[in-house]
């Protein structure tokens, strides 16, 4: 019995040591999780990569200037299970993106929430639940 306890305790302790850094990676502290922001613009690039797919969007600002936004979604593995691939969004696509904006005021959104989505200009959801 003693021979089995020590290895199990060692494994358990090791898991405790890595649990903090793993949860920190998925922390939401950089984003305003209380409010949703809607962004309408033109896709300039879609990176279907891990750990998070990225959508680059040019948005016309209130003052007529172009704002370069980045929307971070789930992993490409997760999106693939939802039927999406690297060709789901293309440069020039007009999109409406809903997500949690970066707290520091940067043009960034976090899309890993069920109520977040990416829709075309007619509000047809292109990418939704899997964000």
Feature roles, as predicted:
Residues 41-43:
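Conserved hydrophobic positions within beta-strands
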Residues 49-59:
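Short aromatic-glycine-enriched beta-strand elements
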Residues 81-97:
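Short nucleic-acid-contacting surface segments enriched for D/E, G, S/T with interspersed K/R
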């Amino acid at each position: 019995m003693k021979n089995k306890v020590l290895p199990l305790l060692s494994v358990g302790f090791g898991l405790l040591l890595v649990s903090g850094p793993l949860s920190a990676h998925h922390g939401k502290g950089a984003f305003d999780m209380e409010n949703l922001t809607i962004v309408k613009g033109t896709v300039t690039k879609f990176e279907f990569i891990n750990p998070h797919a990225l959508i680059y969007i040019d948005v016309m600002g209130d003052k007529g200037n172009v704002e370069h936004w980045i929307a971070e979604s789930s992993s490409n593995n997760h999106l693939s299970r939802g039927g999406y691939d690297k060709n789901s969004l293309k440069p020039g696509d007009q999109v409406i993106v809903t997500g949690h904006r970066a707290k520091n005021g940067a043009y960034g959104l976090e899309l890993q929430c069920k109520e977040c989505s990416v829709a075309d200009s007619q509000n047809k959801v292109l990418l939704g639940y899997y964000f």
